[in-house]
Amino acid sequence: MTPLALIMIIAAYLLGSISSAVLICRLLRLPDPRTVGSNNPGATNVLRVGGKGAAAAVLLCDMLKGTIPVWLGYYLKIDPIILGVVAIAACLGHMYPIFFHFKGGKGVATALGAIAPIGFDLTGMIMATWLVVAFLFRYSSLAALVTVLLAPFYAWLVKPQYTLPVAMLCCLIVLRHHQNIRRLLDGSEPKLGQKKSA
């Protein structure tokens, strides 16, 4: 691994560690998303506690945390596997942020942002899948899980050289959703627009 690759991996983790949800909620004087709703500092929980505007801001910032380091690596023609590690580092920063006591989000938006530089076709397929599943079933977590399970197949169709990095990233997202999977199975997972009961 080259020094440049190592620097990019560390920088991606540190950028990912900036918790958009916590900072935006502080700025807007909203409750800390780590202590209300689903206790997850992500766009879906901010939607529950702060509305669409705050959630959209969090979504955009979380995506940029993945897009910026991966786009830079893609521009510098870093090996696809290393690029995958950079993407994972950004997501790990979001999930376990060093600046916020390692209590972070699920990494879905950051992962989408990390995949975006690979191509608009792949990004469009991923976003369309999430939107369709979310619209039909009203579960953000289910939409995320279905999307990440299909994402490696989409990558294989349009950019096969990135199939393994995308699959690595998706495995991380699935593991991070283990509690959501349990709640989906027992019927206690809150739907979109529904406040999580205490």
From Swiss-Prot:
Subcellular location: Cell inner membrane
Biological classification of the source: Bacteria, Pseudomonadati, Pseudomonadota, Gammaproteobacteria, Vibrionales
Pathway(s): Lipid metabolism; phospholipid metabolism
InterPro entries: G3P_acylTferase_PlsY
Reactions mediated catalytically: an acyl phosphate + sn-glycerol 3-phosphate = a 1-acyl-sn-glycero-3-phosphate + phosphate
Transmembrane intervals: 4-24, 53-73, 80-100, 117-137, 139-159
Entry GO terms, CC: plasma membrane
Topological type in the membrane: Multi-pass membrane protein
Protein name per Swiss-Prot or TrEMBL: Glycerol-3-phosphate acyltransferase
Quaternary structure note: Probably interacts with PlsX.
Family: Belongs to the PlsY family.
Superkingdom of source: Bacteria
PANTHER family for the chain: GLYCEROL-3-PHOSPHATE ACYLTRANSFERASE-RELATED, INNER MEMBRANE PROTEIN YGIH
Record-linked Pfam families: G3P_acyltransf
Function: Catalyzes the transfer of an acyl group from acyl-phosphate (acyl-PO(4)) to glycerol-3-phosphate (G3P) to form lysophosphatidic acid (LPA). This enzyme utilizes acyl-phosphate as fatty acyl donor, but not acyl-CoA or acyl-ACP.
Alphabetical GO biological process terms: phospholipid biosynthetic process
Keywords: Cell inner membrane, Cell membrane, Lipid biosynthesis, Lipid metabolism, Membrane, Phospholipid biosynthesis, Phospholipid metabolism, Transferase, Transmembrane, Transmembrane helix
